[in-house]
Amino acid sequence: MEMKVPNGLTLNDEWTPRNLMLQAFPEAVLPDHLQEDELPLSPVYKFVSRAMKLDRLLEVWIPHGANIVLTGENWSVMLKEYENDSWLTVGKTSKSSKTQESENFVCKSNHVRFKTDHLSTFKLIGKIDTSKSTFVFKRMKVVAFCSETRVGEDLVVRVYCFDDCEWSFERMMRTEQKTGGRLMSPIESVSFSVTSGKDVDISVKNLAGWQMKKASPLKFSYESLRNSFNVIPRCDLVFQNCRKTLSTSIFVEMVLNHEPSGETTIYASASLKKRILGDPLVRALDPEKVEE
């Protein structure tokens, strides 16, 4: 029997301990001295229960962000446990196989499985092969949001590039819910190369009736994407109306160039809130200058 618990984990067992709680937080909260060829593949997961030790093994599934399907031979996925103020490796895949199974550690295309008889703190780390001129990809997603905007105001588009796991998605959604964010685009996939050393540039196209006023920045930096489990990379684009007739909606095409895997295109749109009679801007405008 599978039981989904918050933050994307799955407990796969007919038996689960009572009063089980789960805390998930960025890797930076309990920092690890990662090597140059290592990067986080999950947040830190801490299991909390009244019972410190279990009376039987519990199977746990943790999602990871490595693109095993495309570049599994260049990834080594490690399961680490926090003990005595330090991180210890308790499970590891082989670089010679896309999936590595052992008695207590299994790595699949988008998650690992392991069994534990105690409740502790775990995370996943990816180690990449830098001895060859090869590309190693991480699975990510990109999406655009905006807040409620009135006709005649500048529109701020927030573009996120987040890890392809439930925890990152929920974390981003909580941020947007606090500011009344509105979804502008479908969620698209991005294969980010963790070995290219290149930023992911964003270009904006087909801005009918609008122009980009500023961007901070107009890219996702390489370092921010490598460490996206700590801070979700975000780009804020500000658009202003450039028509004599004010637009009541916006459509924008954004292209992410992520060499060497190619490009990802986002089509984002939103309707602007109409102003009511008595609004200072309405009084200042000729009614014919606002789109119906």
Model feature map: region roles:
Residues 1-292:
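Proteolytic cleavage junctions
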